[in-house]
């Protein structure tokens, strides 16, 4: 089903199911013999959602040959891809904390459990924004698990298409303090104009010294929906019915790094291959050639004092 301006979802449908997919990837990556990350909450959260495909994946009952262009190397690259992505955002959080930032905002938090699993300094407050059903499910599931947040947690149940800055302020957010912003796995699900508006709003809410971590997909401009559907057909046959072409917004959009620089941020970008190399993970030479999304660039930014 195509996106609409007022569509909504839970963690088993639409955009929400992609959050469950990402959490399943974190669970598998955490169980890797040589793990880059440790997310002990990913597996129980995914099991609680109850999507059979991901449950079978966690149980080891899913033949990895069902994945597009599968091979042992590609299967490992998928696991490593989620590991390096997670590690990048973890490291951005910890770097901001080391620099004295004590206010964190996770946009479209999904099943992100960083509030619970990262070693936050005393006094850190983490705001988690997402659809009300998503926030309620994750909060209750982690409570049922007996999980304790490692920072002061402020769930903010709000759609990012609504007045989320007002909801954030109502939860206690202080725009005069530096903030670490995370927008992980979000931008492709925003129309181009909404992406620009998001960054402009983040900038307006950011004090000097604030940081931002995100990633973008240059190939979203000419995303090949037919190729994506063809590659995912074997997954549908095994019960995973996530139609990415109907969930993402394609077409020309303002380059992320250019937009942020123009707003006063000091920006650096890291290509996926470079990130794999940083963490000692091999990347198949033609990985981007078989991925309909293509390259991924990971972005870290700091707001300059004179922005």
Curated annotation (Swiss-Prot):
InterPro entries: Ppm1/Ppm2/Tcmp (IPR007213), SAM-dependent_MTases_sf (IPR029063), SAM_mthyl_Trfase_ML2640-like (IPR011610). Signal peptide: none annotated. One of its GO terms (molecular function) is methyltransferase activity. The keyword Lipid biosynthesis does not apply. It comes from the Bacteria. Keywords: Methyltransferase, S-adenosyl-L-methionine, Transferase. Pfam families: LCM. S-adenosyl-L-methionine binds at residues 130, 159-160. Its EC number is 2.1.1.-. GO terms for biological process: methylation. Belongs to the UPF0677 family. Exhibits S-adenosyl-L-methionine-dependent methyltransferase activity. This is Putative S-adenosyl-L-methionine-dependent methyltransferase Mflv_5025. It comes from Mycolicibacterium gilvum (strain PYR-GCK).
């Amino acid at each position: 089903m195509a996106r609409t301006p007022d569509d909504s979802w839970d963690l088993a449908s639409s955009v929400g199911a992609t959050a469950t997919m990402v959490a399943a990837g974190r669970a598998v990556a955490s169980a890797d013999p040589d793990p880059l990350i440790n997310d002990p909450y990913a597996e129980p959260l995914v099991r609680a959602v109850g999507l059979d495909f991901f449950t079978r994946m966690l149980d080891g009952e899913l033949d990895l040959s069902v994945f597009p262009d599968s091979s042992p190397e590609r299967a490992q690259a998928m696991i490593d891809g989620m590991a390096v992505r997670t590690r990048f955002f973890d490291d951005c959080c910890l770097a901001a904390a080391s620099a004295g930032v004590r206010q964190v905002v996770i946009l479209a938090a999904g099943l992100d459990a960083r509030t619970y699993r990262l070693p936050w300094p005393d006094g850190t407050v983490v705001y988690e924004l997402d659809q009300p059903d998503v926030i309620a499910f994750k909060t209750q599931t982690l409570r049922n698990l007996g999980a304790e947040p490692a920072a002061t947690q402020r769930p903010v149940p709000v759609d990012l298409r609504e007045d989320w800055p007002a909801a954030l302020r109502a939860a206690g957010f202080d725009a005069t303090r530096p903030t670490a912003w995370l927008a992980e796995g979000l931008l492709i699900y925003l129309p181009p104009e909404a992406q620009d508006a998001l960054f402009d709003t983040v900038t307006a809410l950011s004090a000097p010294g604030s940081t931002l971590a995100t990633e973008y997909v240059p190939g979203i401009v000419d995303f090949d929906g037919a190729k994506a559907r063809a590659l995912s057909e074997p997954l549908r046959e095994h019960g995973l019915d996530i139609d990415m072409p109907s969930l993402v917004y394609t077409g020309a959009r303002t380059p992320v790094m250019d937009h942020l620089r123009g707003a006063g941020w000091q920006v650096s970008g890291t290509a996926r291959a470079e990130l794999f190399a940083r963490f000692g993970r091999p990347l198949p030479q033609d990985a981007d050639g078989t991925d309909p999304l293509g390259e991924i660039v990971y972005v870290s930014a700091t707001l300059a004092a004179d922005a």
